[in-house]
Amino acid sequence: MRPALAVVARLALAAAPSLGAADYTEQIRKGRKEIGEIVSMSIENSWVPAVTQSDDFQRPAKLELGALLKQFETREAVVGVVGLGYVGLPLSLCAQQAGFSVVGFDINPGLVEDLNASRSPLGHIPHEKIAQACKEGRLSATTDPDRLAMADAILICVPTPLGLHREPDLSFVEDTARMLAKVLRPGQLIVLESTTYPGTTDEVVRPMLEKASGLTVGIDFHLAFSPERIDPGNERYGMRNTPKVVGGITPACTEAAAAFYGQVCDTVVKAKSAREAEMAKLLENTYRHVNIALVNEMAIFCHELGIDLWDSIRCAATKPFGFQAFYPGPGVGGHCIPIDPNYLSYKVRAELKHPFRFVELAQEINSRMPGYVVDRAAELLNTDAKAMNGAKVLLLGVTYKNDIADQRESPARPIARKLLQRGALLSYHDPYVDGWQVDGKDIRRAQAPTEQADLTILLQAHSEYDLDAIAANAHLLLDTRGKISGDSVYPL
């Protein structure tokens, strides 16, 4: 059954022809108490006119948009965020800091409990930040989807991983759309932030919302796409000062999304539609993906040619135009670069019936790098008259990027797997990772990054690491990041 607040909203919709924007908003707000509580309320006949809503009834779009824009401007709007992970939690905090009341939804009860107890589930977000938001009374977390009915804007920040055959897995997005359709009410703004292929917002999310709710995009509610641009650990660019791209299903949807994000971000960029916004995100990540693959392949043949690629990049980067520096490494990791370009490749193959060769080649090269690292490790051990089987190998930094705890798609894991398969006695050190497993096997944690080993491999140059001390103490050091020089240091 639709929650009471949604019923209130539908009755207000029926009354809309005789109500002004302010009165319409007020009728909706009569169905609210404080944030976090949905109430059943009796509907007074004195304010509900004797009209019934027919299937072809349409409330003027200006009324809906005008009321919503005012709520955003005055910060009276309640914001709902679905998914409180690396994207949803920072977005929730940014909206709360902008003056909005935020209801965060997640299916993980432990995460919700942590947030409501002022504990941060993410290492790069301090507990104090969560505590302050909760203390101010404008941030709460829940596992109850009915509480999203009170939200004026609902932002979807759920994972979009790859399936077993590296095909797009939209199950989290689809589950969220089904859930929101049950609480969707007129006047709401729904925004998908999860990275996906062009057309998902219009072809997947829209029909699921419309069919189950009986409401229509652009008439009853707004639907848009706005790609997340979170860079965990980046202290220079955060949610506030990173430009926000928005694209709606209709122009009014774009305006509604732009109005909300304009209160949260310094700069809003309007795309022509949701499809252009979806493509913009994939373009950003595909650009990085193929350029990282370029320098990774160059690193392999530069080693064979005896050329210091890092020095070549340093020199090339002095050109003030037409060049952007990318650097080789042990592979690509994180929630974007290894995943997102595959969504675009899938879309091209599925609809146009031909491959996106740049992406597929880049994927092949970047996926090859962990194996190349292990081959270089074996080569270095051989020069020291040691076999990989039985050699003590220490991995430094197992997260996907420096100075954060995020291990998603980290190349450290496939590297470790290959080292174990060759018989290496493996240990690791990472200031952000207290315990680490590979295929269910616990890997011993070294007491210090300078612990003695037959071979030390630097995978992430965390700022906490004293790289000079590591170089001075290592018997053999394979530097996959080009950060260290020394007699016992060998580049990728």
Model-derived features: positions:
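Leucine-biased recognition of intrinsically disordered, low-complexity hydrophobic segments
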Residues: 5, 11-13, 19
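General helical structural elements
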Residues: 6, 14, 33-36, 485
